[in-house]
């Protein structure tokens, strides 16, 4: 009986820090992440909790800097990499020169590899192809079709369908003009 009590006591003591960590609120995990990671450097559960809390915070606040913080903690985090690459792609896409569009296409393509079930990167690839060369119909069309095969929220799906329809109308206009 004494052995069981001792084993139970040892088990309780060794589990106590984990329970204390798990009781931290998400805000504490986000804003005290540096000190928590310093205090518990080998706690992978704590690290994952901090990353999850930061991802949720970044999503709700649309804050790219939080994704960059996550990449410092976990350089291979696919969600943070996806958002960082999409942000880079948006910045390149805003530029008016062709090399900017090629850089945007590259960033969006890389983002698509990190979360391969989302169609949004393919929509933006199509937009970049259209901006790069308004006479290129096949590459944007291929990108829009790929986008529609994957997950899109309703608003983005409507945007893709509208862009695809405008592209097809423009393609028909050019084709009819050159008959």
Task: Locate predicted features.
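Terminal, low-structured helical/coil segments at or just beyond the last alpha-helical repeat
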Residues: 141-179
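Alpha-helical adaptor scaffolds
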Residues: 52-59, 67-68, 72-121, 128-131
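TPR alpha-solenoid repeat register
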Residues: 46, 80, 121, 156-160
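A conserved position within tetratricopeptide repeats
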Residues: 33-44, 58, 71, 75, ...
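Alpha-solenoid repeat scaffolds
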Residues: 43, 77-78, 95-99, 135-136, ...
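Sec-dependent N-terminal signal peptides
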Residues: 3-13
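N-terminal leader/linker segments that initiate helical-solenoid repeat arrays
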Residues: 15-61
